[in-house]
Amino acid sequence: MKKIWKRVCTGLLALTTILTALPTTSVYAAETQYWTESSERVGYIEHVMNDGTIHSTFNEGHMKVEGETAYCVDINTGFKNGYKTRHDASASMSTAQIEDVALSLEYVKQYRGSHSNLNANQGYLLEQCVVWQRLSEYLGWQCDNVRAAYSEISQDIQNEVYAGARAFVQANKGRYKCGGYIYTGEGQDIGQFWAELNVGNAKVKKTTANEIVTN
């Protein structure tokens, strides 16, 4: 019996020695990477500064994350196709900022739905511009009136949309659940935002550029 026990102890000691000699590998949870791209050019943007000067004019691309629409959230940085890491927008934006951007986008989407004269590219340009306008006000870019070139979308339509978006935000704060994601990596960050009508708020306050109408 003593011989058997001795053999068992010797075997366990040998196994422990082998395991100790093996290299230790730390296991980390890999961060999910999302493919981001500027899939096509949709039209020209005029980077208008608050003093009225045009800082630059450029042909804007349609930003996408895994094929889904997204928006540039840093007008001062060039975009590069590639993989980016997704973060909840609340990690870098306040609740008020997220709500402002999300509701502005919601207004433009509703406007597009009722104005068939706008094509898909024009609609995207308007959405991208309201994102930049809201972020410029919060982040001090000094380009609160960035716009699509008037050759892309008329001044009258743009004025109506931008004024309407501001009115819609003021009329509907607290009526929607708003959120978003920011994708970071090499080059320009991009974002996605949404606004979902809260349960119990079935009546949405719609707006025009001049007045607020409640159904």
Where are each of the predicted segments found?
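C-terminal segment of classical bacterial N-terminal signal peptides
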Residues: 5-10, 18-27
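Short, surface-exposed polybasic-aromatic patches that bind anionic ligands, especially phosphate groups
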Residues: 30-208, 213
